[in-house]
Amino acid sequence: MATRKAGSRLETEIERCRSECQWERIPELVKQLSAKLIANDDMAELLLGESKLEQHLKEKPLRQGASPRGPRPQLTEVRKHLTAALDRGNLKSEFLQESNLVMAKLTYVEGDYKEALNIYARVGLDDLPLTAVPPYRLRMIAEAYATKGLCLEKLPVSSSTSNLHVDREQDVITCYEKAGDIALLYLQEIERVMLTNIQNRSPKPGPAPHDQELGFFLETGLQRAHVLYFKNGNLTRGVGRFRELLRAVETRTTQNLRMTIARQLAEILLRGMCEQSYWSPLEEPPYQSPLDDPLRKGANTKAYTLPRRARVYSGENIFCPQENTEEALLLLLISESMANRDAVLSRIPEHKSDRLISLQSASVVYDLLTIALGRRGQYEMLSECLERAMKFAFEEFHLWYQFALSLMAAGKSARAVKVLKECIRLKPDDATIPLLAAKLCVGSLHWLEEAEKFAKTVVDVGEKTSEFKAKGYLALGLTYSLQATDASLRGMQEGLQRKALLAFQRAHSLSPTDHQAAFYLALQLAISRQIPEALGYVRQALQLQGDDANSLHLLALLLSAQKHYHDALNIIDMALSEYPENFILLFSKVKLESLCRGPDEALLTCKHMLQIWKSCYNLTNPSDSGRGSSLLDRTIADRRQLNTITLPDFSDPETGSVHATSVAASRVEQALSEVASSLQSSAPKQGPLHPWMTLAQIWLHAAEVYIGIGKPAEATACTQEAANLFPMSHNVLYMRGQVAELRGHFDEARRWYEEALSISPTHVKSMQRLALVLHQLGRYSLAEKILRDAVQVNSTAHEVWNGLGEVLQAQGNDAAATECFLTALELEASSPAVPFTVIPRVL
């Protein structure tokens, strides 16, 4: 009785070792079994033959695509064991089947494919049961189907008939699909059994759970079917096979395989499938699909059934993607999660190979995520994904650069610059990286000192190629030009303007065919009031690129500086025919129409701008109250996304480029406006600020036209519309001051101008009008002080020089007043209808 119990325990342990592929333990267990039980010699032969074959394959694994090398001495002993077990015929039928399956596997390893197929035919492979069998038997059957598929692939078709070729291909694929399905079932079963054993184990510690390995045959069964589908031009079935594998409940052994398959399927969905040819994972595949080879015939459904299948994920409310990008994104996010979970980050030399594989796998996933999210414009989400990739990114330029670009696209410019600095460290010879950093610093960030450093780096790195060197000088010129705008001292302004001019001249000489170099050189000359020279270069820019909106705008402003207002307006109209939604051009058109066509035309343009605004933005105007100007209905409609429209930064309408004072002022305005709005309980503004700032500027331009024709009531209504959007904007407060001044309320006007200057201390128009009001009130000394400060801020404002002359004359200082009047006359002769700085200065 004790002997029978011991034998039962040994048999159970042997079955467990076979299921878990612990082949090194089998010989010792066989010895114990032979010593305790009689008549187990044949079983021992089977077990020893199987374990030695598996040990041999573990030491010298087969490779996909490589042919077995024929009989080998090491396998002779395996054949002896198996032949002995089969020849005596004392084994039970199921163990005889197992012996034949192992023999067929050995025959394949030795290279005798035909004999292996004969053995499978004798065994009746398709009739072997899958229910009520131990896990190791499932593995053996799965490997048998994979081996049969390999043998069929190796052997030539006996006839050249195309139908036989198609039938053979289908037989091969069916073998691999069955192998894969049964392999998944085996892996689920063995994991369930192992977990049960761990839970039932006594408190004393036992052997650690054994990590399963797929091995050559199971891996072939799981991965070969879809490869053949794609090779044969049947993308529909290939995608279907991928989905079947992914829907099976995951095991520890299949985690890496699932990640690979998910990544491959995502790549096919993104690169090989359009929305029209997509079908949902829960739908039947189309009978005929444009994805497939048109010469291939047959249904896109399975040609077999199995009595037992692997468990699949199921349940209520499970998410199911509805289009290809959505499914690809789901797959990639799952792959990303797995890549992060299994990341190898250790820097010790022994882990170098694993770390490189982990990095390569993660990089492919993040590259595909970039494609998927980039298509949807989801740059915020992409930057978050790539931020998680930073754990892999030590000394890896590609991931750092992808992260920087995603931050740029998401509008996170400050972080993007910091990441680009790391990219520059990793790849110091690439001039495009500091050029991108300079672009961000010159643009919305307005970090001009940083921009100057990056621009100089581009110049230094670009010594080898004139193209990058020219771009470096262009960035340097823009930096100096913007620094000149920011400078509060006239001498510093002039020095920086000279440096900007030299940089633009160098850029133009290095790249004479670059329209941007010619344009910015012309713009800098215009800002310095060298009008004839500027005209020459802007015409060069237009010869190089005749439809450039900024060049056309500059040409119009230069013509207006020469008092050719009608010609300037014609140029603006021509530019608007190409760019009808460019608000910078439209604002200039309002000013020019006021000068040469009268206020009615200007007001019609304001009305037209409001129509364009409401046709472009999917926003709701918080100022809609049924009150205010009757220029236009204030119902906001939607037609297109706002990112297709060209917008300046309207924190200061006199400069299309951001500068230090306007950055500070706009932040103060936004904070104060939000406080004011909350106190007034008005609805919050939805979406980005730019559209609302544009709308406010439209109303302010209309108010300015009404002030010009002496209509304070209409001007007040328009100003109120802007105030409903930004009650603490210095532009709104300045316009309120102008309306009060028009009504003759000088004390009220003074208060409005002072409030505007408290928010934006360098707003020249507010300084000039405040000084004029103080002059009216007889406060000459204070008016003179304010005007002298204004001259330091903008030495080309002829209104300021004229006002200073009037104040000095009122104080009896006629000589100084005369000099101011002459300067004002000289500047007015070259003054454009709109300041040249309204044109954006960006890379």
From Swiss-Prot:
Q: Name one GO biological process term.
A: protein localization to plasma membrane
> Keywords assigned by UniProt?
Cell membrane, Cytoplasm, Membrane, Phosphoprotein, Repeat, TPR repeat
- Pfam families (alphabetical): ANAPC3, TPR_16, TPR_2, TPR_8, TTC7_N
Modified-residue entries (Phosphoserine), positions: 160, 202, 625, 629-630, 673, 677-678, 681
Tell me where it mainly resides: cytoplasm
Q: Which GO terms describe its cellular component?
A: cytosol; plasma membrane
Q: Where in the cell is it found?
A: Cytoplasm, Cytosol; Cell membrane
Question: Is Disulfide bond included in the keywords of this UniProt record?
Answer: no
Which InterPro entries does the entry link to? Endocytosis_PI4K-reg_protein, TPR-like_helical_dom_sf, TPR_2, TPR_rpt, TTC7_N
Q: Where are the TPR repeats?
A: 97-131, 219-252, 363-396, 397-430, 479-514, 516-548, 549-582, 696-729, 730-763, 765-797, 798-831
Where does the source fall among the domains of life? Eukaryota
Subunit record text: Component of a phosphatidylinositol 4-kinase (PI4K) complex, composed of PI4KA, EFR3 (EFR3A or EFR3B), TTC7 (TTC7A or TTC7B) and HYCC (HYCC1 or HYCC2). Interacts with PI4KA, interaction is direct. Interacts with EFR3 (EFR3A or EFR3B), interaction is direct. Interacts with HYCC (HYCC1 or HYCC2), interaction is direct. Association with the PI4K complex is strongly reduced by TMEM150A.
The UniProt function text for this chain reads:
Component of a complex required to localize phosphatidylinositol 4-kinase (PI4K) to the plasma membrane. The complex acts as a regulator of phosphatidylinositol 4-phosphate (PtdIns(4)P) synthesis. In the complex, plays a central role in bridging PI4KA to EFR3B and HYCC1, via direct interactions.
The UniProt entry, under PANTHER family, shows: TETRATRICOPEPTIDE REPEAT PROTEIN 7B, TETRATRICOPEPTIDE REPEAT PROTEIN, TPR
This protein's name: Tetratricopeptide repeat protein 7B
Gene source species: Mus musculus (Mouse)
Originating gene: Ttc7b
